[in-house]
Amino acid sequence: MKKTAYFLALLTGIAPPANATGGMTCRTAGSRPIQVSLVIGHTTGSPLVSGRLMDAGRAIEVRAVQWWLDASELRLLLVDPQATRAELALKAKKNGRFYDGTIVRSGRARWVRCRES
């Protein structure tokens, strides 16, 4: 019994840390930037994603309703809290350490760069 308890304590002490969450920050260029901050929960199956939207320094309440993230592409759709209006659509491709692409907000497309945070 003591050997089993000792062995379990040893295994617990050498277990690697669980990297259960990650994040990305996407930002447009210009004087009135749009910034999207994503928290990505790594789970079995599809990841859980939550997002925060800042438009020219003003926080916009949003919900992430659709997303796609893999080694080569990031896609995201953010809507208002009642899910009646699309607030932002993002589509970006892997470019070295970044994801570069387009954000569409209020009918206007803008270039965006996303970084892991």
Could you describe each region identified by the protein language model?
Residues 4-14:
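Sec-dependent N-terminal signal peptides
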Residues 16-20:
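Sec/Tat signal peptide C-region and signal peptidase I cleavage site
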Residues 22-88, 100-117:
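Central antiparallel beta-sheet cores of small beta-barrel/beta-sandwich binding domains
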Residues 93-99:
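Short, highly charge-biased, low-complexity peptide segments
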